[in-house]
Amino acid sequence: MKILLIAGGWSPERQVSLNGARAMVPALEARGHEVTFFDLLENFNGLLAAAEQHDFALINLHGAPGEDGLVQAMLDQVGCPYQGAGPAGSFLALNKCAAKQIFRRAGLPTADWDFVPAFPGKDWQPRLPYPLFVKSNTGGSSLRLGRARNRAELDDIMGQIFAAGEEVIMEPVLPGREVTCGILGEDPLPPILIEPVAGDFFNYESKYEQDGARELCPAPIGDELTARVQELTLAAHRALGLRGYSRADFILGPDDSLTLLEVNTLPGMTATSLVPREARTIGLDFGQLLERLMELGLADCKKKQM
């Protein structure tokens, strides 16, 4: 197929996107596909024209545009198939506050949260007790994520987020370990247990640097907990109306409780990424995983045209 590989963009996660796309090109070409690399930052105005000249668009964007559903909506306008969630599901998943409302309504276990769209007054106090995890409401890759133990630390982190033009969401710091689980089609993949080495939580360095974290796959958490993680992952995927694939992140508490953190609709595709690691556990190499995502995207496009 003639594949338009859409990457780059202008979000703070641009470099992560480019790194993943560089890994995808040889895997696709080895399977006989003709790949056109398309950097959204350099030629956003040419997206629709380029999409019309290709059989499939592989989206490897992080943040907005891309995870916000804009690119998907544009591709839908010209009938170009792509992998993963459509515009609405992408937008809902990217907005953590909106997604958490949907999770809560669906009966999924998610932590309490405060949403702060603009810098509050000096007399304001967070509703939740310290310490708090503070992050961008629409950011990803654990960028602009911090732990605040008091108002001074909270103001510092919020200031960085607001300076980037984004809103703040904060949650209590939950004891436990992080578990992540992908969906491929309607099938949950084997979960991964994440133990950060660089830092005490899964931040940007832990996520993308070699040896930044120990990622144990399949997660050594027993069959019962594994099944529960997979059940919740599929439930979150469906609650947001997603398609094709996604990845859900959880905190596994000391009492074996599970708390859903968020769902990623365009999971990372670098050499250290989580979903490719999970796919390898079930026998799919990187090229086979990409092929499966394209098969799912083509089938989804046909359904929309019926």
Swiss-Prot record:
Annotated keywords: ATP-binding, Cell shape, Cell wall biogenesis/degradation, Cytoplasm, Ligase, Magnesium, Manganese, Metal-binding, Nucleotide-binding, Peptidoglycan synthesis
Gene Ontology CC annotation, any one: cytoplasm
Keyword Ligase carried by entry: yes
Protein's pathway: Cell wall biogenesis; peptidoglycan biosynthesis
Enzyme superclass (EC): ligase
Protein's GO biological process: cell wall organization; peptidoglycan biosynthetic process; regulation of cell shape
Localization (cell): Cytoplasm
Superkingdom assignment: Bacteria
Residues annotated for Mg(2+) 1 binding in this entry: 249, 262
Free-text function comment from the UniProt entry: Cell wall formation.
Family the UniProt entry places it in: Belongs to the D-alanine--D-alanine ligase family.
NCBIfam families: PRK01372.1 (NF002378)
Name of the featured protein: D-alanine--D-alanine ligase
Species this protein is from: Desulfovibrio desulfuricans (strain ATCC 27774 / DSM 6949 / MB)
UniProt lineage: Bacteria, Pseudomonadati, Thermodesulfobacteriota, Desulfovibrionia, Desulfovibrionales
